[in-house]
């Protein structure tokens, strides 16, 4: 029964009693084509066929970000630190602070550039603790697509990330082919994926 069409409890009860929205003879093996096999009995055959096509994993790689173990020390608002200590471009050895995507409200295409991170200290053994996860150093500063891991009930907004590092609050996708980058971000922000 698909009772989500009922506006209130009484309407849903009538849908149930009138046998409206009942899906008969649904082949449960169809669910195996959907990754993680959620029960989606209302999907048509054409929708189910889409799960057999190319997936986002075929054209992009997803990565989690940095866990500092002590955000009070490592993460600052950009206006809390001396501006000349912030690097806006990739560099090694690491500068005192680099731009940092921590997550936040949903903003399409660009945004959430409020933080800087003491990346140099993250690699210093005297600051190391068991809670630190430094992430994939090769993905630091690379052009990526990011979104907020947590948020309200509104749809996720995918935005451009470049020349910064990301925390776990901003998971990222890296296009395997750089020419696909804008196609991916446009697709993910479309009504098709929401």
Regions found by a protein language model. Give the residues of each.
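Residue-level signal for pocket-adjacent positions within structured domains
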Residues: 105, 114, 153, 168, ...
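Glycine-rich, charged/polar anion/phosphate-binding loops
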Residues: 130-132, 157-158
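Short, intrinsically disordered, charge-balanced linker/junction segments flanking boundaries
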Residues: 150, 189-194
């Amino acid at each position: 029964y698909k009772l989500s069409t009922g506006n209130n409890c009484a309407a849903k009860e009538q849908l149930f009693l009138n046998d409206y929205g009942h899906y008969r003879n649904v082949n449960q093996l169809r669910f195996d084509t959907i990754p993680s096999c959620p029960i989606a009995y209302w999907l048509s055959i054409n929708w189910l066929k889409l799960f057999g096509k190319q997936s986002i994993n075929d054209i992009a790689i997803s990565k989690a970000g940095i866990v500092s173990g002590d955000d009070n020390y490592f993460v600052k608002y950009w206006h809390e630190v001396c501006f000349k200590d912030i690097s806006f471009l990739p560099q090694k050895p690491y500068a005192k602070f680099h731009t940092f995507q921590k997550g936040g409200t949903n903003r399409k295409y660009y945004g959430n550039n409020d933080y800087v991170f003491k990346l140099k200290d993250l690699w210093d053994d005297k600051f190391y603790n068991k809670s630190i996860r430094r992430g994939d150093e090769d993905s630091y500063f690379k052009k990526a697509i990011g979104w907020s891991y947590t948020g309200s009930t509104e749809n996720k907004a995918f935005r451009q990330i470049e020349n910064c590092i990301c925390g776990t609050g901003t998971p990222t996708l890296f296009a395997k082919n750089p020419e696909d980058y804008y196609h991916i971000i446009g697709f993910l922000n479309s009504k098709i994926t929401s």
